[in-house]
Amino acid sequence: RKNLGSFMFNGEDVFKKINVLSGGEKVRLELCKILKKNPNLLILDEPTAVLTPQEINELMQIIRNLTKEGKSVIIITHKLKEIKAVADNCTIIRRGKYIDTVLVEKTTEDDLASMMVGREVNFKVDKEDAKPKETILEIKNLNARDTRNVQILNNLSLEVKAGEILGIAGIDGNGQSELVEILTGLKKADSGSITINGNEILNDKPLNIFNKGIKNIPEDRHKRGLVLDFTIAENTVLQRYKEPTFSKNGVLNNEAIEKHAKSIVEEFDVRPTDYTVKSRALSGGNQQKVIIGREVDNIRVDKAKTNQPQLLIATQPTRGLDVGAIEFVHKALIEQRDEGNGVLLV
């Protein structure tokens, strides 16, 4: 309690299991462990990647306090507001090369972004007004419990129309993850109704839900989006490898898979362009491009087959990405909306 007291843990929290701590609590706990050794230099690598806005503000204040106490802090981040909030100097590295070191107070966010990406970055998403059409996803009176058997979704109802992006906002732990798991078939609901293009999918199998029109950019690209030890090419056909285009009699058609991967790599500017590289070797932004490219391609294929709009679920799609990759993700979601599909943005 003594060690954790200054990091906003109350007395009861010290008895919590680690697996139930929030992202912010885990980061603060790691800081406590480090600071107990009284280091002179702290290196924080993307410390806010899984934090809420409130937790980020709290961490920024902790960092300020540490520097006032004479500690030196190196914070590795791509988030411009965090650089402006706590850094005195900023060194920019792009593709493994040193670009420049600047005084933060004399450098604008636009200048930092340009140095990071190597070009001018558009922070404003250019988009026309939405033109919503028919309802493609309808949820009625959905009820579900979390892993602690606590009611997490309580008579939830919503609709997503073709040609619109519906956003779901809220702090982590308020049912968003459970909703997405239910929509993709990874979790069972207690009751309610979910239809996609008029087809009931409540508690259906994941592959059936996928085939009926729901595609997913998951929150955790490492656990749910990619098989990290598979190549880029193999990851582009995760849901479709059994189709005749990509396999015959249980044997994969590597030539067809690689041709398919090449088109995705080129269209979505995945780097490196070598689709035989394991996905583990890619940066976070390029891993996300592989996932988005795969799901957009899945949407095109199934839309052509069924002549029905598809639903793309995107959960925290820009988490952990640099400003250039964030710009790419925003444009990709807008394009899906403009092509007449629905987007559920969590």
Summary of predicted features, one role per range:
Residues 1-44:
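ABC ATP-binding cassette signature C-motif
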Residues 45-346:
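Glycine-rich phosphate-binding loops of nucleotide-dependent enzymes
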